[in-house]
């Protein structure tokens, strides 16, 4: 039996890492032991190098352009997809992804203002138009709360240092995409962790019952 692909999405500080652990524990409770976790950008040796390029602040005067950022993200994504995710799913392993294609639609589309049609065509070319996660959990919260949480973790990377308005645009695009796709379930990540955990578990139950 083919594995399932579950993706966790959200702004900085939304609690994606905690949600990944919640999903993994829930699947184990239902005797689903063959599970791997991935992150984007990253997940392969080459993709991790690309992650470093995207996340770090430039040490010289060269600025990473918005289009270059988008192309790097899809290069990292297709490496992860073809080398890790697809083989795992084909072998019956479940995959829990910390971010996937929806991030680029929200961050580069909503945040950077790159046309959604171009991002879709790039996604179709690199990932294939028929490949989609079985379930995406979008952890929604106000950007100011997410950034407050992110600052408590310590040093902010290049993306996390963007303006509040940037993250407001991202959230708006996330919400727009969520309403348009029944496979994306919105979780209110501003609520207490116990409530967030229950909401995630309920969304997973719906997937398992299909």
Curated annotation (Swiss-Prot):
InterPro entries in UniProt: P-loop_NTPase (IPR027417), Thymidylate_kin-like_dom (IPR039430), Thymidylate_kin_CS (IPR018095), Thymidylate_kinase (IPR018094)
Coiled-coil boundaries: none
GO biological process: dTDP biosynthetic process; dTTP biosynthetic process; dUDP biosynthetic process
Catalytic activity entry: dTMP + ATP = dTDP + ADP
Tagged with keyword Kinase: yes
Keyword vocabulary terms for this entry: ATP-binding, Kinase, Nucleotide biosynthesis, Nucleotide-binding, Transferase
EC numbers for this chain: 2.7.4.9
Lineage top rank: taxon: Bacteria
Matches recorded under PROSITE patterns: THYMIDYLATE_KINASE
Any single Gene Ontology cellular-component annotation: cytosol
Top EC group: transferase
Binding site for ATP: 10-17
Function text: Phosphorylation of dTMP to form dTDP in both de novo and salvage pathways of dTTP synthesis.
Similarity remark: Belongs to the thymidylate kinase family.
Protein name (database record): Thymidylate kinase
